[in-house]
């Protein structure tokens, strides 16, 4: 095996049609276009980056009445590591799936059902930089060029210096994929407490610093398709403290959302921001009984793994409890619903991300009635809509969700709860549910969904 240049893996599938070769003189793959029809993959195209400049590829195959689906790869932080698929006796590629170092694509075409030949294009510690194969009216075969993953592609987060005083103990939360929620607690003189909810590899983690007071906390939640771009830090010298302390925080996001000022804004302000337009990925600073200083880590905004096709449907129900958002995944595997005396008291969802099953946080409060489970036959089964009811119940100020029913591409679940009150349906034709959000306290007050287009076609035996 040669290590002096790109490595070429032979095309998998049939050799019918015209041979095509995009070449290997690329830095990476930036976009993939796939059209899947009744007989398999009809057409495919790859866009690349070469010497830092975008390069459009050519279409291979002929698109019929099918629609073209796209995958965007955020070069250079994200790169393609494998392509998997299968072909049958027609020597046409029937289904394909792509994996990057950040996420796994939808399955395009038919899922493998046991009658055909599976293949995988992958080289350890290498990335895909080009494709080749054969195509006629459909994609007959596909192979790939690989090159070592350059260390220069590993983006080092930018650590922005902490602003404020020198008191307290140093903390450093490190770097995460996302900052999902920020909690700020006030004291008599400034910010006394902060808690940050992070996400890494699909799992939520929290870090807190300082000391919470009887004033409690205020929160700022970031939408799953948004990210924080800057933090304004107000500092001041306050009687009783040997150094300056943080008196207020203001957060701004890429979509133009600005939080209210959490605390007392002063004339002396600093802005924590990345000069390259990066997104917030973690915090560091100094704290004890108050927050003395705050700094931040920023990562390239291209590390966002949320597909641009994701939509967030507004949560339905009453305006009670605290907001929660599980984020966006590849799909839903399992749903657990717990009943209370008058409504839905608890929900939790098991998702799929890449090759991992991820159990989300519980929302609400379990009762002695326990939980009921609705399990999906993932990945061939997916949720297409969520129906429910919400109503005002005695002793609770805000309406609560009283019933939930889940519809998939194969069946409808039983109603979990009592079908009474205001009816709602969370649905958009051609989309499937890949995440949930809402509001909950001791009961579930609201529920909403994240959805993505349904790209997968499934072969039906007749």
UniProtKB/Swiss-Prot annotation:
Induction: Up-regulated by methyl jasmonate. Expressed exclusively in flowers, in male and female organs, petals and pedicels. Not detected in pollen grains or sepals. InterPro entries: Jacalin-like_lectin_dom, Jacalin-like_lectin_dom_plant, Jacalin-like_lectin_dom_sf. Signal peptide: none annotated. It holds the Pfam family Jacalin. Residues 13-23 have a biased composition (Basic and acidic residues). It comes from the Eukaryota. This is Myrosinase-binding protein 1. GO terms for molecular function: carbohydrate binding. The keyword DNA damage does not apply. The keyword Repeat applies. Residues 1-23 are annotated as: Disordered. Belongs to the jacalin lectin family. PANTHER family: JACALIN-RELATED LECTIN 12-RELATED, JACALIN-RELATED LECTIN 3. Keywords: Lectin, Repeat.
